[in-house]
């Protein structure tokens, strides 16, 4: 039961943070920058926590709870599909590229920073 409480509490925090951050970041040339921002921030934090040693309770609270609800693949997929549906082909491909490439760069930065 303790695990579920930590995950649920973290989920509440992450969802509130996601709403706050993503609603404050405007679209940039049709790119849903709010979703990109939360996914990039969440990826970097998750990478730092994963590559460092942390107690299992932190995994439940932060990695699964907070970051699981803070980041959002489903919104990324929906917003990207909407770009395609609206005929925004360049923005469609750019959004995919930015989300994947920047998040991979974020993981790499965290890994390299902790390897020094």
UniProtKB/Swiss-Prot annotation:
Cellular component terms per the entry's GO annotation: plasma membrane
Membrane topology term reads: Multi-pass membrane protein
**Which positions in this protein are listed as binding Na(+)?**
68, 71
Pfam families registered for this protein in UniProt: CRCB (PF02537)
GO-annotated molecular function: fluoride channel activity; metal ion binding
Question: Any idea which UniProt keywords this protein has?
Answer: Cell membrane, Ion channel, Ion transport, Membrane, Metal-binding, Sodium, Transmembrane, Transmembrane helix, Transport
Q: Which reaction does it catalyse?
A: fluoride(in) = fluoride(out)
Record GO biological process: cellular detoxification of fluoride
State the InterPro entries in the record: FluC
Q: TM segments? A: 1-21, 31-51, 58-78, 92-112
- Function text: Fluoride-specific ion channel. Important for reducing fluoride concentration in the cell, thus reducing its toxicity.
| Stored NCBIfam families | crcB
Listed name of the protein: Fluoride-specific ion channel FluC 1
Species the sequence originates in: Methanosarcina barkeri (strain Fusaro / DSM 804)
């Amino acid at each position: 039961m303790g695990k579920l409480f930590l995950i649920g509490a973290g989920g509440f925090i992450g969802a509130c943070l996601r709403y706050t951050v993503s609603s404050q970041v405007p679209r940039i040339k049709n790119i849903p920058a709010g979703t990109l921002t939360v996914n990039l921030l969440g990826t970097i934090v998750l990478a730092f926590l994963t590559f460092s040693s942390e107690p299992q309770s932190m995994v439940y609270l932060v990695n699964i709870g907070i970051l699981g609800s803070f980041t959002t693949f489903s919104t990324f997929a929906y917003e990207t599909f909407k770009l395609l549906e609206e005929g925004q082909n360049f923005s469609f491909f750019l959004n995919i590229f930015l989300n994947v490439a920047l998040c991979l760069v974020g993981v790499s930065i965290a890994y390299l920073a902790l390897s020094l």
